[in-house]
Amino acid sequence: MYKRQGVYDPNIFKAFFLAGGPGSGKSYVVRRTTGGLGMRVVNSDDAFEKLLKDADLSLKMPDSEEQQREPVRQRAKEITKAKQKNYINGRLGLIIDGTGKDYDKIAYQARQLETLGYDTHMIFVNTSLDVALERNAKRARSVPEQIVVNSWKTVQQNIGKFSNFFKGNFIIVDNNNAQEDILTDVFKRIKNLANQKIKNRRADKWIATELQKKGVKFSGGQSQFKKFAGKRR
């Protein structure tokens, strides 16, 4: 039995951007809809919350701790950036968690990944403003209400832009009160996109190089690679 990693890892060259403001329930949705796909989650919030606890700082983000909190936030970003770099070096499948408030930044990141051979997608988790405010208030790490309002409005303005950019690779999830049947449908759609053969032809060169390092000949074409990789799993 061969360990699946690098070129043999499931869903290499697939990147899913996750968008949705504070209180949208992104973390819940991604847990319920991407399990078992072998994707690596890139989320600075995880490192940030751990470092806040280690520094004995409140998850409620009070203004009185802003000065102590900022270096912790920067350290969390550095840790996350290093992890993402390692994942990308192995062309591993990615779930890149963010709010979606900065369209230009996400579009730039997506184009950079595409130059490396990735197929890019977006999962947009949407809620009403009232639901977002209610959920934010119940979170262990909440943010000020005005930040939720401003973020929600900005993210809403970007829905059309993201839809045009990602086109058929854009999935929107209504998470005001997502029932099991909705999450099951979203899981199927994500799994279908993740399992599709890689459309970006730049991936072939990288796959061929990695297989050659292992003494395997690869003439190109995802069907050949998937057939071979399936035997090694």
Segments the model singles out, each with a brief description of its role:
Residues 1-5:
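Conserved small/polar residues in nucleotide/adenosyl-binding loops
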Residues 6-13, 86-88:
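Phosphate-binding P-loop
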Residues 15-17:
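Short hydrophobic/aromatic beta-strand immediately N-terminal to the Walker A/P-loop
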Residues 21-22:
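The conserved Walker
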Residues 25:
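Conserved glycine(s) of the Walker
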Residues 28-92, 104:
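Conserved substrate/cofactor phosphate-moiety recognition/catalytic segment
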Residues 114-135:
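Conserved phosphate-donor/acceptor-positioning beta-strand/loop module used by diverse small-molecule
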Residues 130-233:
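Conserved GTP-binding G-domain of TRAFAC-class P-loop NTPases and closely related GTPase folds
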